[in-house]
Amino acid sequence: MEPAGGGGGVSSSTDPRSTYVLSNLAEVVERVFTFLPAKALLRVAGVCRLWRECVRRVLRTHRSVTWISAGVAEAGHLEGHCLVRVVAEALENVRILPQTVLYMADSETFISLEECRGHKRARKRTTMETACALEKLFPKQCQVLGIVTPGIVVTPMGSGSNRPQEIEIGESGFALLFPQIEGIKIQPFHFIKDSKNLTLERHQLTEVGLLDNPELRVVLVFGYNCCKVGASNYLHRVVSTFSDMNIILAGGQVDNLSSLTCEKNPLDIDATGVVGLSFSGHRIQSATVLLTEDVNDAKTVEAAMQRLKAANIPEQNTIGFMFACVGRGFQYYRAKGNVEADAFRKFFPSVPLFGFFGNGEIGCDRIVTGNFILRRCNEVKEEDLFHSYTTIMALVHLGTSK
């Protein structure tokens, strides 16, 4: 989605009146441009100064979060992962210019079965090739954060009211595209476990908005390669540095970090660490609920959703997140699938839902809306934030569209 280089004039056979209108009347040009996707707008921005200014104004009006998802229907082709193919096609028609992208894909096909059995060099090459292919589809200035997990939760493209799908096994993925939103700052962060230096400097946390930031509202946090020695303790150490603030904290443990374009050095697929996104801005409202082990049928799941509904988070311009344990899902609900995602849809009919099945969950019951906080972070013990055999459901509202 890069701007095309310079201009190209209008053909001499063009109607002179049309040429005059499209070269001089900004209102008309802007109206025409509202029908074009972002990629086409970036191409025509190089034609002349008038068109460039019109493109800038039109893109400023496109501020809604967009998503691209790939599920069972898109899987099964031999030419690469389904998410790469679907993103390449869908970006031709996306109307926003993404500034930050969060994508998640299933581990089994993003990293092939043969490579998972121990061919480390092949695994590293394949993982990075797939991740690089995906990253190259987005603008160079776009910050891309990508992780791979055992299972994926996606809402099909087209409408936020589409039925979300819990895909516990199989090729799948999604990409959340965040444009630049007035009054909201989204920052990726990454802390790599270094056995020689486990100290987290205050400036590292401040630079990514996790400390000394009165507008911090939400942190999505993910520990990767947590099966390795010391990795889980490192995740606890990182989270403890900002968990006592009045913010929403949600996430979990995933298999691997596959993309982080803001990093200067190539990612080491065998490293362990903590990665995520911080959301800052007074317009943000958010809430989370924890579905504990005793939430094990449709009735108790719906009771949890009622608690989330009671937070009264606006549904417009809101994203739902579901971070579940791999031990839940189909087998946990006595061979009944999609129980939690369906319950979410029942109570939030127009909010798209995304997430994963992972190896541990982070979060608790909490509401952050304006100056009101239910169950302040400093009232929650650290062990109450880390769970297994649970699900974290979260709502993140990014302000009313202007």
Curated annotation (Swiss-Prot):
Q: Which InterPro entries match?
A: F-box-like_dom_sf, F-box_dom, FIST_C
**Any idea what a deletion of this gene does?**
Fbxo22-deletion mice are almost half the size at 6 months of age as compared with WT mice due to the accumulation of TP53. Other mutant mice died within 2 days of birth.
Which GO cellular component does the record give, naming just one?
Answer: cytoplasm
Question: Keyword ATP-binding, does the record have it?
Answer: no
List the keywords (alphabetical).
Acetylation, Cytoplasm, Ubl conjugation pathway
Answer whether the UniProt record assigns the keyword Cytoplasm to this protein: yes
Residue intervals of the F-box domain: 18-70
Q: A Pfam family for this UniProt protein?
A: F-box-like
Instruction: Briefly state the protein's biological role.
Output: Substrate-recognition component of the SCF (SKP1-CUL1-F-box protein)-type E3 ubiquitin ligase complex. Promotes the proteasome-dependent degradation of key sarcomeric proteins, such as alpha-actinin (ACTN2) and filamin-C (FLNC), essential for maintenance of normal contractile function.
**Self-association and partners:** Directly interacts with SKP1 and CUL1.
Name-wise, this protein is: F-box only protein 22
